[in-house]
């Protein structure tokens, strides 16, 4: 039987390689917030992750990503909005995570929070895309979300987020993710048990 006495395990993915990446700064701020609530957090660094299909999935960076996804009980995806959508940097990370690895499903039943940053006015195109991807990855995406407009104005020089309604929303999102993860993590097997898969297994075994 799985032991759920450990803190909720939250993996952060972000979608920019810039030195002062606002999607990374937003993810790091969210990580600090949810850590104070009691979660354990890990971040995947997308630098040196090859393009999907460029190398075998035995590549060390791919294996690191897959192991982190399997370790996680919840995830946070943070992306800039680029041409009305998420960046290729984030999409490449998601594309490397398969729906199945043998009998293991690296994302099924995980909770998911989505966040985006914009250089201009507030937009929701990136978070909407991430919600669609979360559904395809069989994840439980929480209702709340964060969209930070003019992100270059919202962070101190040290990378921490300024006190503002945008930061308040990030706190709300992390609080909701923490609660949903606690509520769902020991019920994933029950919630993801499907008639069609049971039927297919009977036909295969029979």
Swiss-Prot record:
InterPro entries (alphabetical): Arsenate-R_ArsH, Flavoprotein-like_sf, FMN_Rdtase-like_dom
EC number: 1.6.5.2
Regulation: induction: By arsenite and arsenate ions, but not by CrO4(2-) or Fe(3+).
Regulation: Inhibited by NADP(+) and weakly by dicoumarol.
Catalytic activity of the protein: a quinone + NADH + H(+) = a quinol + NAD(+); a quinone + NADPH + H(+) = a quinol + NADP(+)
Single biological process term from Gene Ontology: response to metal ion
Source organism superkingdom: Bacteria
Pfam family, one: FMN_red
Disruption phenotype: No visible phenotype. Sensitive to the oxidizing agent menadione in the presence of arsenite ion. Decreased arsenic and chromium accumulation.
Cross-referenced Gene3D superfamilies: 3.40.50.360
List of residues binding FMN: 16-23
Cellular component annotations (GO), alphabetically ordered: cytosol
Names of the cofactor(s): FMN
SUPFAM superfamilies: Flavoproteins
Keywords, ordered alphabetically: Flavoprotein, FMN, NADP, Nucleotide-binding, Oxidoreductase
Gene Ontology molecular-function annotations: ferric-chelate reductase (NADPH) activity; FMN binding; NAD(P)H dehydrogenase (quinone) activity; NADH:ubiquinone reductase (non-electrogenic) activity; NADPH dehydrogenase (quinone) activity
Subunit structure: Homotetramer.
Family: Belongs to the ArsH family.
Protein name: NADPH-dependent quinone reductase ArsH
Gene source species: Synechocystis sp. (strain ATCC 27184 / PCC 6803 / Kazusa)
Gene that this polypeptide is encoded by: arsH
């Amino acid at each position: 039987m799985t032991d759920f006495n450990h803190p909720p395990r939250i993996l952060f993915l972000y979608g920019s390689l810039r030195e002062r990446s606002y999607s990374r700064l937003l993810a790091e701020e969210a990580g600090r917030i949810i850590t104070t609530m009691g979660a354990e957090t890990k971040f995947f660094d997308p630098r040196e992750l090859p393009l999907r299909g460029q190398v075998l999935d035995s590549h060390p960076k791919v294996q690191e990503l897959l192991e982190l996804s399997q370790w996680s009980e919840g995830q946070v995806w943070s992306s800039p909005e680029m041409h009305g959508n998420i960046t290729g940097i984030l999409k490449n990370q998601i594309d490397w995570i398969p729906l199945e690895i043998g009998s293991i499903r690296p994302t099924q039943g995980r909770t998911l929070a989505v966040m985006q940053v914009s250089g201009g006015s507030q937009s929701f195109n990136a978070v909407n895309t991430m919600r669609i991807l979360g559904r395809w990855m069989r994840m439980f995406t929480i209702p709340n979300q964060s969209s930070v407009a003019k992100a270059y104005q919202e962070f101190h020089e040290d990378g921490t987020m300024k006190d503002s309604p945008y930061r308040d929303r990030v706190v709300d999102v992390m609080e909701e993710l923490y609660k949903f993860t606690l509520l769902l993590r020991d019920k994933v097997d029950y919630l993801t048990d499907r008639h069609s898969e049971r039927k297919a297994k009977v036909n295969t075994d029979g």
